[in-house]
Amino acid sequence: MEIVLANPRGFCAGVDRAIAIVNRALECFNPPIYVRHEVVHNKFVVDDLRQRGAVFVDELDQVPDDSIVIFSAHGVSKAVQQEAERRGLKVFDATCPLVTKVHIEVTKYAREGTEAILIGHEGHPEVEGTMGQYDKLKGGDIYLVEDEADVAALEVRHPEKLAFVTQTTLSIDDTAKVIDALRAKFPNIQGPRKDDICYATQNRQDAVRDLAEKCDVVLVVGSPNSSNSNRLRELAERMGKAAYLVDNADQLEQSWFNDTCKIGVTAGASAPEILIKQVIQRLQDWGAQAPKELEGREENITFSLPKELRIHVTQA
């Protein structure tokens, strides 16, 4: 059996930054450090941070007064921001800058009284945060659609003053279809010059497309609640390949690889490289050859830590 590695794969700049914020806060201020929601959607990462003293909570009412709280990479609503400010909590915001960009777009549309449509998955923390950034005081509203059927059923109050934004971790192909449906139904709709799907999502979907063309089976290392990891698995399946989403090597089943010549391995943007190495080692234990990595797009984007945390680090 051959192992073929997608390139790029694994951590993106936003995930790197979010994890670094939690680690730096733990170093500078000591545990407990509270984190609203999983800072990134990966069980291994969250469990590791929890062991170091991070306390993950669902809502701010679980955070004691005078505590430090970190907002996850997925972003939060204005209501959450305002509650933290009202309570005087010390906040470090790990929201991915590319999610913040969408928040800025939504805030601008609300201020103008332009209604907004968010393309995204209901219940995802990023969607909840983005929807909650829209202030309805100017008479507009924000609507959520996931697919073309949602667009067909959608009724808005002001179709002549309408814009769309997207969740950053969607399927590129599916999102293009939804945008086409929106433009067909609402010819005057505004949108970003380039959709809001982030560079890492785009690159990893391009890489898994290349991987699936060359392999019989595709493994995606990532947690079940990771949106971008699920999109990678779905993309490989749409290309006619057996594809499996696994949190770690222990979830692999040897029967998946009967009569398999080439196994493709990739990882979602919140999966650390150590998990990929463990998957490769398990496959090699079962007789696979040393992995070969495909050529891919180089990623050299980095995001800086919040200014206030950099100051605390310097003082420490």
From Swiss-Prot:
Residues given in the record as [4Fe-4S] cluster binding sites: C12, C96, C198
Binding site for dimethylallyl diphosphate: H41, H74, H124, S226, S227, N228, S270
Annotated GO biological process: dimethylallyl diphosphate biosynthetic process; isopentenyl diphosphate biosynthetic process, methylerythritol 4-phosphate pathway; terpenoid biosynthetic process
Domain of life: Bacteria
HAMAP family assigned: IspH
Function: Catalyzes the conversion of 1-hydroxy-2-methyl-2-(E)-butenyl 4-diphosphate (HMBPP) into a mixture of isopentenyl diphosphate (IPP) and dimethylallyl diphosphate (DMAPP). Acts in the terminal step of the DOXP/MEP pathway for isoprenoid precursor biosynthesis.
Protein name as annotated: 4-hydroxy-3-methylbut-2-enyl diphosphate reductase
Species of provenance: Acinetobacter baumannii (strain ATCC 17978 / DSM 105126 / CIP 53.77 / LMG 1025 / NCDC KC755 / 5377)
